[in-house]
């Protein structure tokens, strides 16, 4: 046991690229339900940046668009 180090190996994960920056899209449309659904879980929660890979600017815009779509009943707040 001498000489063994008890520790976890650190994995280098590839940094996710913001999909909105890659597409060079101007604004995130709250009426585009198919695009917004990719960033919402089955339970209706908004995916965090570290999972979705969005930059801070687009994550804020995405959150506003999802909340706006929920308020006008385009997206559900929760599932059944």
Swiss-Prot record:
Keywords: Ribonucleoprotein, Ribosomal protein, RNA-binding, rRNA-binding. InterPro entries: Ribosomal_bS18, Ribosomal_bS18_CS, Ribosomal_bS18_sf. The keyword Membrane does not apply. Gene3D superfamilies: Ribosomal protein S18. Pfam families: Ribosomal_S18. GO terms for cellular component: cytosolic small ribosomal subunit. GO terms for molecular function: small ribosomal subunit rRNA binding; structural constituent of ribosome. Part of the 30S ribosomal subunit. Forms a tight heterodimer with protein bS6. Binds as a heterodimer with protein bS6 to the central domain of the 16S rRNA, where it helps stabilize the platform of the 30S subunit. Belongs to the bacterial ribosomal protein bS18 family. This is Small ribosomal subunit protein bS18. It comes from Clostridium botulinum (strain Hall / ATCC 3502 / NCTC 13319 / Type A).
